[in-house]
């Protein structure tokens, strides 16, 4: 346990001291401690000669106590209750040594970017992966898996999306009504003629998280059959396509 000294350097009570810094008796309760440089600067002006050593010690301690009260004052906390607070609670969190994680409040939906992509002659899987990356927000340096950080993506000309190989006739889409014998199966060509938007939605949904966040992110995808879309007010920009093999070679 540290002790008080009346010399040129001062030592302060440790966390196990039963008498608090502000004069209130506390049983086995940590007290408010302060950094040495700040306290030394506060009592530097009190280094003057005195006729009595005991008087000098008392005067230095009084000035030190007043300086600490002024510097680390907590207006909303009574003086006799400040022993319950640590230095971090008095001066604020240590932001330099604490990892910061973005919260959902840091990303307002009205501030998100809007992208538009023309699906004409684009490979379905490669286009869907690019869309999922931007909806998820993985293209951002501050990406956090648990936060909605992505953008909105608009897909036009969904009926002109392309696939490679023999997927037009071999790729199957299945759905079930939930009743006995309710399994329905159709090929890529059949579904593209019936509901072309569902093909892109199915591909992107499978690349998003499975859960509440994934269901919320899926609402950021807007797919349209033709070349027009009703989101001109959002001023969408072209989706960056960096995959050189994303377009079908003719």
From Swiss-Prot:
Pfam families: Ribosomal_L13. Gene3D superfamilies: Ribosomal protein L13 (3.90.1180.10). GO terms for molecular function: mRNA binding; structural constituent of ribosome. Residues 1-47 form a transit peptide. Keywords: Chloroplast, Plastid, Ribonucleoprotein, Ribosomal protein, Transit peptide. It is found in: Plastid, Chloroplast. One of its GO terms (biological process) is negative regulation of translation. Transmembrane segments: none annotated. It comes from the Eukaryota. GO terms for cellular component: chloroplast; cytosolic large ribosomal subunit; ribosome. Belongs to the universal ribosomal protein uL13 family. Component of the chloroplast ribosome (chloro-ribosome), a dedicated translation machinery responsible for the synthesis of chloroplast genome-encoded proteins, including proteins of the transcription and translation machinery and components of the photosynthetic apparatus. NCBIfam families: rplM_bact. Component of the chloroplast large ribosomal subunit (LSU). Mature 70S chloroplast ribosomes of higher plants consist of a small (30S) and a large (50S) subunit. The 30S small subunit contains 1 molecule of ribosomal RNA (16S rRNA) and 24 different proteins. The 50S large subunit contains 3 rRNA molecules (23S, 5S and 4.5S rRNA) and 33 different proteins. This is Large ribosomal subunit protein uL13c. The gene is RPL13.
